[in-house]
A protein has these predicted regions:
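Surface-exposed binding/hinge segments that line
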Residues: 124, 138-217
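Extracytoplasmic/periplasmic ligand-capture domains
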Residues: 4-9, 20-30, 77-79, 107-137, ...
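Long beta-strand-rich cores associated with HINT superfamily self-processing modules
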Residues: 558-586
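N-terminal hydrophobic or amphipathic helices and topogenic motifs
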Residues: 2-43, 49, 56-61, 68, ...
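Extracytoplasmic
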Residues: 37-39, 69, 88-90, 99-101, ...
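Active-site-proximal polar cores
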Residues: 551
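Short Gly/aromatic-enriched secondary-structure transition segments
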Residues: 56-66, 121-123, 193-198
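N-terminal lobe/hinge region of extracytoplasmic solute-binding protein
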Residues: 45-97, 128, 235-239
Length: 586
């Protein structure tokens, strides 16, 4: 038996985001309407470059933003909803009564940018290819878990790679339909399919460019590529409304309209994302109308709101958190740990394995100053990775507060007193263009120095793609990063932050079997009360273990020129590298 899914399907998951109520919209106009510049081009000024154009590899918002303009998924989120879906490359779909079989009818008459027609075999290939590639810190864990069962997050096992035939058995073609065979019911599965990692690629084009050719040998050769190692890392061939013209890393991404798009043509002939590190330069570009929207750091919000001709969306409820991450086993090749010894001129590789170090750092952070000065009030402290607006969030979970006395006690106890006696020197890292991250590092730097002048923190900015690759290699002793929801369920927050196979925990070399077990119990339970108890326990363990320091949940503020029309905010979608198809100027 199957239950028929209508054109718009609502997933039975609790979501408490009311965007239409919470988003406020304001204009800052001076001297009448602005004269529209470049009416056929949508121009974005962003601070962050993309990591990859490969949908199976890219797992950052900058990459996802470009991918969603070039590629398409089987279904897409409906407007601002995180739980309703409309057809995209699938025209219809069914879900079996037991929740373990998903079937999608593939749209006829669609072509890739290469000119090749879309077929059900392309869809099957796209998901099998993603699991074959399975970049260690990529998004593929979200497919392995529902398709292979809880506790299965990767193609790699202690006995080698999962047999290719097992991967192929999970996605099958049946005429014009493609069927997913899940190992377990999995409520967020449609949310996962609707995001950038669910994008459909051109099988023939991929193979022509050296990608997986369907064989075991190719599987072994292409599994877990290094940074930039995907055969389609810097090229693209989707079915979407825009085509890749050029990606110049660190400079710009340029897209052109797909005039053969199966849907209505996009309003813009081109979409250009310029990578501009400095806020002052982005501010000038936005004010002159040379760009249509720009990433505005929190420190620049007030002056941007006062600029003429600007449309502002503020108090936007995001599903985004920020944190300091500790590296539990720093790679020997790191250049950010000084001498590599606890001699006052560096730190040892396992510096943060001592819980008193982690607790001392946590008590040394000043949340009030950070939220007031760095975020200019557009944020709030949260105590665990689970953000407000997600089911099972509880505001009374235990959390750290600034307490330099407690910080001193823990740092005196760390490393049997040797840390306090000798001091240390290390480097904190934040992303280029992230002014709030810089301020967070400075707060910690100053407070630790106040506790003991022998505690020396250096601060260094890095480009976003470099941070991602260095994070994977374990070379960053401590760094600022964040997480935005892949889908609106607490599992999507606790897994990356705390499970030993999660993207952050794995990069940090953090592992706790008790935590892993609780996380797996929570996602497998269908009982609301049981899940609440389990997430309460997970939040308490996060507090006790301090695998990272949760800094804040962000309230979004977005800035456009007042001639931009059609913007609909969805907390699951990236914003500044936004879906330009629905936008226009007028």
């Amino acid at each position: 038996m199957t239950k028929r899914v209508a054109t718009i399907i609502t997933v039975s998951i609790i979501v408490v985001i009311c965007i239409s109520v919470l988003v406020s919209r304001s204009f800052s106009c001076n001297g009448g309407p602005s004269e529209i510049k470049n009416p056929d081009i949508f121009v974005i000024a962003d601070a962050f470059d993309i990591a990859s154009l490969d949908p199976a590899y890219g797992y950052d918002t900058a990459s996802a933003g470009q991918i969603q303009n070039i590629y398409e998924t089987l279904v897409e989120f409906h407007g601002n909803s995180t739980s309703e879906f409309i057809p995209s490359l699938a025209t219809d779909w069914t879900i079996s009564e037991d929740g373990k079989t998903y079937r999608f009818k593939i749209r006829d008459g669609v072509s890739f940018h290469s000119g090749n027609p879309l077929t059900p075999e392309d869809v099957e290939y796209s998901f099998e290819r993603g699991m074959v590639q399975d970049y260690v810190l990529g998004p593929q864990w979200m497919f392995f878990e529902p398709l292979f069962g809880l506790g299965n997050y990767t193609s790699r096992t202690d006995n080698g790679l999962i047999p290719l035939e097992e991967i192929k058995s999970k996605v099958e073609v049946d005429g014009q339909w493609v069927q997913f065979n899940l190992a377990t019911p999995y409520e967020p599965f449609l949310q996962i399919l609707a995001s950038s990692w669910g994008s459909i690629v051109d099988m023939d084009w991929c193979i022509q460019n050296g990608d997986w050719n369907g064989t075991e040998e190719s599987y072994e050769a292409l599994n877990n590529p290094g940074p930039g190692g995907s055969p389609i890392h810097s090229i693209a061939d989707g079915t979407g409304p825009f085509m890749l013209e050029l990606w110049e890393p660190g400079i710009a991404v340029r897209l052109v309209r797909n005039d053969d798009y199966w849907g209505a043509p996009a309003s813009f002939e081109r979409v250009v994302t310029q990578i501009v590190d400095e806020w002052g330069t982005r501010k000038l570009m936005l004010g002159l109308g040379d760009v249509d929207c720009a990433f505005v750091p929190n420190a620049g919000i007030q002056e941007a709101k006062e600029m003429p001709g600007i449309l502002v969306y503020e108090n936007v409820p995001t599903l985004l958190n920020q944190a300091f991450f500790f590296q539990f086993d720093i790679d020997l090749t790191s250049t950010l740990i000084g001498s590599g010894q606890l001699d006052g001129n560096g730190i040892p590789m396992n510096f943060f394995s001592d819980i008193d170090v982690r607790k001392g750092f946590a008590y040394a952070f000043d949340w009030d100053t950070y939220i007031d000065d760095a975020l200019t009030g557009y944020g709030e402290q949260i105590s665990s990775p689970i953000v407000k607006g997600i089911p099972y969030y509880e505001p009374d979970w235990p959390s750290y507060e600034l307490d330099l006395v407690q910080a001193e006690e823990h740092l005196k106890a760390a490393w049997d007193g040797l840390l306090w006696e000798n001091g240390f020197e290390m480097t904190l890292v934040y992303a280029s263009g992230d002014i709030t991250g810089k301020i967070a590092c400075e707060i910690l730097q100053n407070n630790l120095f106040e506790i003991n002048p022998l505690f020396k923190i250096n601060i260094q900015l890095m480009g976003w793609p470099t941070i991602l690759s260095e994070m994977v290699l374990g070379r960053l002793p401590m760094y600022v990063n964040g997480w935005t929801a892949d889908y609106p369920d607490p599992h999507n927050f606790v897994f990356p932050y705390m499970h030993s196979k999660g993207v952050f925990a794995q990069a940090q070399r953090y592992s706790n079997e008790v935590v892993d077990d609780l996380i797996e119990q929570a996602i497998s339970s269908s009982s609301h009360s049981e899940r609440q108890i389990l997430y309460d326990q997970i939040a308490e363990l996060y507090y006790n273990e301090v695998p990272s320091i949760m800094m804040s949940q962000i309230l979004g503020v977005y800035f456009f020129r007042d001639w931009i029309q059609g913007f609909v905010y969805n907390p699951i979608r990236p914003v500044y590298e936004m879906y330009a198809y629905y936008l226009s100027k007028g």
